[in-house]
Amino acid sequence: MASDGARKQFWKRSNSKLPGSIQHVYGAQHPPFDPLLHGTLLRSTAKMPTTPVKAKRVSTFQEFESNTSDAWDAGEDDDELLAMAAESLNSEVVMETANRVLRNHSQRQGRPTLQEGPGLQQKPRPEAEPPSPPSGDLRLVKSVSESHTSCPAESASDAAPLQRSQSLPHSATVTLGGTSDPSTLSSSALSEREASRLDKFKQLLAGPNTDLEELRRLSWSGIPKPVRPMTWKLLSGYLPANVDRRPATLQRKQKEYFAFIEHYYDSRNDEVHQDTYRQIHIDIPRMSPEALILQPKVTEIFERILFIWAIRHPASGYVQGINDLVTPFFVVFICEYIEAEEVDTVDVSGVPAEVLCNIEADTYWCMSKLLDGIQDNYTFAQPGIQMKVKMLEELVSRIDEQVHRHLDQHEVRYLQFAFRWMNNLLMREVPLRCTIRLWDTYQSEPDGFSHFHLYVCAAFLVRWRKEILEEKDFQELLLFLQNLPTAHWDDEDISLLLAEAYRLKFAFADAPNHYKK
C-alpha cells in the first residue's frame, strides 16, 4: 500500500501544472522518445542550470524506475515507458536507462554487448543486423520527421558495414579472404556474379531446345562475351532453337550466301549496278573504327555483304547508314576466334580464310534479319525515319518540356540531329563497345530496333539536358548535339540509358495518346 501511495503521489506530482513549466507536445505521427537516435543530440546539448524543481523530478523518476524495474522487459508497455523517459530533461538519466534496456535485451537474445573503450563516451550502438526484421520487437520506431533530418552521408556510412559484415558489431574490423580492401571484395563478388550469369547462359544454350523467352530475359541486361555470338544468332532468328538443327542450318545458309556471291557479285561493274557499288566503295572507308575497316580483307567482306544485300532488296537498295549496321555483327562473330582487349583494334590477319568466309555469311544473314524489321527506314524518302523523328519530338515535349521549348526557341529542328540517330541506330553517337552492349538489349526486346530504339533516343537526348539548356546559340546547340561527349562511355552508362528508356516505354508504349498533344 505504501508503494501504491508513492506511485499515486508520483503521478500526482508529475501531472501537476507548475507556473511557467514546459509542456511537451507530441504530434499524431511523432513516436516516443528514441534514446538511440537522440543520444548524440542530448550529449552535445549544453545543460541548463539545474533548478530545485528539476532535481526533485529526477530524484522522483529514479525512485519510480527502481520500483518498477520489471516494466523494462520487452512488452506492450515499452512505448509508454519510453515516453516517460522523454519527459526527463536530464540526459544522463535517460542514457543510463537506455543502456540498461539494451543490455537486458542483448542478454535475452543471447548476444554479447558491446564493450566500450576507456576513451569512448557511453553511447549505445546496436549490433549490425541483416535486412530481415529481428524476432524481438524493441518498439524503437523512427518517425517521419526524424528520418528527414538524418544526414545522407551518415546513412550511407552506416549502410556499408551492414552489408559487409552481416552480424558483426560496428566496432569490429573483419578481414575476409585475407584482405580488407573493399575494391578487391567488390571485384571478387562481381566476377562471381558474372561467372554465375555465364553458367546460366551456357546451360540454356546447351539444352536440346533453347527457351528463347528465357534467353531474352537473361540477355536484356547484357550478354557475356563468350556466349554472345551464339546468343545473337538465336535472338536474331538466324539459327533455330533446336540444338541438333543448328549445324545443318549454318551449313545451308553459308552455302546459300556464297551462291549469291557467285551469281550476283560479278555484276557490280554493270551499268545498272555501277552506281550502287561505287557508293558502297566510297562509304566503307568513312566507317569506324578505322583500324578495323581499313584492313583490306575487311573492306572486301563489307563490300560483298552490302552489295549482295542491295541487289537482293531492290525496294530500298543501298542507302547510306546501312553500312554501319554490318560492323557490330562482324566484330562480335570475329571475336569468337581471336582475343582482343578493344573491339576497335581487332586484327583479322591471323584468322583462317575459311573462318572469315563463315563469319561473312553469318554477318550477312543476321544483318538481313535486322533490316527486315526496319526496312521502311531505307525505302524512298525514308518514311520510317521521318515518322520516328516526329514521334521523338512529341515524346520529348511530354517528358521534358523545358528541353523541347529550349530547342524550339533556338530553331533547332529534331531532323537536324535525330535523323542520324535513327538512320545509324546511334552508332555514330557512342563507341562501338557501347553499341554492342546496346544491341544485346535491342535483340532481347520485341521490335527493339524499330520501337524500343525510339525511347532510347528520348532518354539519350534528355540525358544531356543540363548541357543543352546551357547553350544559348543555334550553332553551338547543333554542334553539341552532333558531337556528344560519349567517347569514354562504358557498359554502365548504357545500362543507365536503357533503364531510363524502359521506364519511358512502360509509361508511354501502351498508351500512345499520352504523348500526343
Curated annotation (Swiss-Prot):
<comment type="subunit">
    <text>Homodimer. Interacts with ACBD3 and ARFGEF1. Interacts with YWHAB, YWHAE, YWHAG, YWHAH, YWHAQ and YWHAZ.</text>
</comment>
<keyword id="KW-0597">Phosphoprotein</keyword>
<dbReference type="InterPro" id="IPR000195">
    <property type="entry name" value="Rab-GAP-TBC_dom"/>
</dbReference>
<keyword id="KW-0343">GTPase activation</keyword>
<dbReference type="GO" id="GO:0005096">
    <property type="term" value="F:GTPase activator activity"/>
</dbReference>
<dbReference type="Pfam" id="PF00566">
    <property type="entry name" value="RabGAP-TBC"/>
</dbReference>
<feature type="modified residue" description="Phosphoserine">
    <location>
        <position position="132"/>
    </location>
</feature>
<feature type="compositionally biased region" description="Low complexity">
    <location>
        <begin position="176"/>
        <end position="190"/>
    </location>
</feature>
<feature type="modified residue" description="Phosphoserine">
    <location>
        <position position="145"/>
    </location>
</feature>
<dbReference type="GO" id="GO:0005794">
    <property type="term" value="C:Golgi apparatus"/>
</dbReference>
<dbReference type="GO" id="GO:0071889">
    <property type="term" value="F:14-3-3 protein binding"/>
</dbReference>
<feature type="modified residue" description="Phosphoserine">
    <location>
        <position position="167"/>
    </location>
</feature>
<feature type="modified residue" description="N-acetylalanine">
    <location>
        <position position="2"/>
    </location>
</feature>
<dbReference type="GO" id="GO:0042803">
    <property type="term" value="F:protein homodimerization activity"/>
</dbReference>
<feature type="region of interest" description="Disordered">
    <location>
        <begin position="103"/>
        <end position="191"/>
    </location>
</feature>
<dbReference type="InterPro" id="IPR035969">
    <property type="entry name" value="Rab-GAP_TBC_sf"/>
</dbReference>
<feature type="compositionally biased region" description="Polar residues">
    <location>
        <begin position="163"/>
        <end position="174"/>
    </location>
</feature>
<keyword id="KW-0007">Acetylation</keyword>
<protein>
    <recommendedName>
        <fullName>TBC1 domain family member 22A</fullName>
    </recommendedName>
</protein>
<feature type="domain" description="Rab-GAP TBC">
    <location>
        <begin position="222"/>
        <end position="446"/>
    </location>
</feature>
<comment type="function">
    <text>May act as a GTPase-activating protein for Rab family protein(s).</text>
</comment>
